Structures are given as structure tokens and as C-alpha cells.
Amino acid sequence: MSSRVVVSGPTSWNRIVQVDHLPEPVPHMQFALGDHETVGGTSAGKALGLAALGRPVELFTVIGSDPDGDRLRAILAGVAGLELDLVDGVRTERHLNLMTEAGERVSIYLSTPDDRPSPADRRLEAAMTDAAVIVLDLSERSRRLIPTARAAGRPIWTDLHDYDGTSEYHQPFLDAADVVFMNADRIGEPMPFLRRVVGNGARLAVCTLGADGAIAVSSDGATVVEHRVDAVPVDVIDANGAGDAFMSGVLHAMLDGADVDAALEAGARHAASVLVTRHLHPSLDAILG
């Protein structure tokens, strides 16, 4: 088995618009505080984070044959330590993200790629068999390859993002995962849910709480333990990618042998490094400015 992590899921080209508050659902005018374009996508964020930490990582993602896709390919190809396996999705996924200084976000999907089965799926299937960890982010490709990932016998990590506890789309990811990450945006009180996830077979379930850090529940098969980690205080420039960086930091630390508490602290430190850049990860600063 290699030390390489396989990441499957979205990459996007994003326009970020900073606002002092998220718009109300009524007709009105609102002025932006600023805007910029950058790399997006939860899987790109995780892969960038792992590469920056020195972890061998291969990103399997879908990017369109359009100008935004050309930009994404050129940028990601310039990131040291990041191996890419790209599928032409005709259209590149594009988002318009409205962001507040508090990290609140509304994501408007401007376009989505063609993510139908393709011969390239076989490359991802082959890579899974020798991966230290398989990260399956929410996407059609990841979802249809869940049975293959489970058959590979390698640990599966997933990120449910703002899961509400009932979404049918998320359920196969939840059922397959050994390690589950999510945020608290829509779950209500997260601790009972995390305990339920671990009770159903996951060995670790983590919920990020923004400025309040994160909580987690772990199990070694006999003992269930609750964990908490504080956020590392920084002056926040942009919260995009912080959750991906947190998960990357935890994953890298655990593969290096850290226990859960030490890994959560490593995740918090890595997340803090992303909060002080306007890009998905500080490794993009030198490329995008």
C-alpha cells in the first residue's frame, strides 16, 4: 500500500463577492465590498491542502473544455506535489459565492459539468486499490463508484458539508464512510448525530463549528470518546476552503500516526492558514496573486 491519498470530486472556477450581509429574499439593490475570481471546489481544496503538507495526492476531477477549464488546468498543473487525472466535462463547474466577513455564504451554481460514466472511471477504480485513503466528495462520479471504493478495502473518508440528517443523496456516502466530516449549518445539535454515525460503524465523525472550532466522536470498537478542538484565532480574510483544509490537516496527521486529539489540532492549524488568504489555499497565492 502506498502513502498516497486519492481524492474524487469537484473542482470549479469561482467568482467570490464580499458583502456586509447576505441578501434578503426580496427585490433590492446591494453594494459589494469587493470581488475576485479563483479556484474553487471542495476536492480541489482538499487536494491542495494535502499537497502543501507533503502528502502524495492524486485528484480525480471533471473540468470542462472551455476558457475557465483551461485556466483551472494550467493553475492546478503548476501546484507542486499534486497529481491530476482530469475528465473533460464539456462545461466547467462555476460558482458565484456571496460571502460575509463572518464566513456566511450563498453559492449560486452558474454551470455544472457533464459527469456521466466514462472510460476514465477505470483509472479511478484502479487507483483506489492502492490508496492509503480514498476521499469521496459529493459528486455523481464519486456516488456511482462507492461500491468500487468499498470493494477496494481501503479507508473511505467523506465530507457531507451542510447535511441536514435526512438527504437521500448523502446517504450512500454516509453508509460507506469510515470517517465522516460535516459542518453544523443544518444539522441542529450535532453531537447526537455524530454519536449515531459512529454507532452505525464509522470510526470517526467530525463536525466543524466555524469560529468555535470543531467537535468529534471516535470509536475503537469498544470505547466511544467525544473530542473538541478550538479554532486557531486569526484575522479572517476569506473563509472559503477552511473546512477542506481542516479535513486535509486531520487526514495527513492521522496517516502520520497522530491520535484523534492531535490530528484535530493539526486540522485547526491548517484551517487557520487558509483563512488568511483570499484563495482556496495559500499555495495559490504565488500563482494567482
Label for each model-derived stretch:
Residues M1, F31, L194-G289:
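Conserved phosphate-binding/catalytic region of the ribokinase-like
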Residues M1-F60:
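Glycine-rich phosphate/adenosyl-contacting loop at the front of the ribokinase-like
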Residues P56-E83:
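A glycine-rich beta-to-alpha transition motif near the start of alpha/beta enzyme domains, typified by
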Residues L53, V90-E93:
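Short, basic and Ser/Thr-rich N-terminal targeting/leader segments
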Residues F60, I108, H227-D230:
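Hydrophobic residues at beta-strand termini and immediately following loops
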Residues M1-T11, R73-V87, H95-V225:
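Ribokinase/PfkB-type carbohydrate-kinase core domain
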